[in-house]
């Protein structure tokens, strides 16, 4: 416990909060170009083939981004928009691709949570 005199000489310094999404540089989203589109397997105890892509951003960062939803149209040189948000069972994946924006199509036949997957409202039958 420091004395008041010690605190006067050298005040307490608050710890700086470290960003969970440094590549976004305080922006809500960033644009980038896919350099590789592939599948990877999650950590134990989960099992699947998760769709991810490596993206070179406009600021020069190269990050891995998760492609959510069923099916996608991304390939190398596709221009994508990424947002923050990690995938808990994929180490190193700290970003999500935004569906329905730029070259990324929305999810087909999506009825619920449509705004998260870039799907238009279905026509009333």
From Swiss-Prot:
GO cellular component, one term: small ribosomal subunit
One of the record's GO molecular function terms: rRNA binding
Keyword Metal-binding (UniProt): no
Pfam families, per database record: Ribosom_S12_S23
Key words of the record: Methylation, Ribonucleoprotein, Ribosomal protein, RNA-binding, rRNA-binding, tRNA-binding
Keyword field contains Metal-binding: no
PROSITE patterns: RIBOSOMAL_S12
Known function: With S4 and S5 plays an important role in translational accuracy. Interacts with and stabilizes bases of the 16S rRNA that are involved in tRNA selection in the A site and with the mRNA backbone. Located at the interface of the 30S and 50S subunits, it traverses the body of the 30S subunit contacting proteins on the other side and probably holding the rRNA structure together. The combined cluster of proteins S8, S12 and S17 appears to hold together the shoulder and platform of the 30S subunit.
Quaternary context: Part of the 30S ribosomal subunit. Contacts proteins S8 and S17. May interact with IF1 in the 30S initiation complex.
PANTHER family registered for this protein in UniProt: 30S RIBOSOMAL PROTEIN S12 FAMILY MEMBER
Name of the molecule in the record: Small ribosomal subunit protein uS12
Species for this entry: Dechloromonas aromatica (strain RCB)
């Amino acid at each position: 416990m420091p004395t008041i005199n010690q605190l006067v000489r050298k005040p307490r310094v608050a710890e700086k909060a470290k960003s969970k999404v440094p590549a976004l540089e305080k922006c809500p989203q960033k644009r980038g170009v896919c350099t590789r589109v592939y599948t990877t397997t999650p950590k134990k105890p989960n099992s699947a083939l998760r769709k991810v892509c490596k993206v070179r951003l406009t600021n020069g960062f190269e990050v891995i981004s998760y492609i959510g939803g069923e099916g996608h149209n991304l390939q190398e040189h596709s221009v994508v928009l990424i947002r923050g948000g990690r995938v808990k069972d994929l180490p190193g994946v700290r970003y999500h691709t935004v569906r329905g924006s730029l070259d990324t199509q929305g999810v087909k036949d999506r009825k619920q949570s449509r705004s998260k997957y870039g799907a238009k409202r279905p026509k009333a039958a």
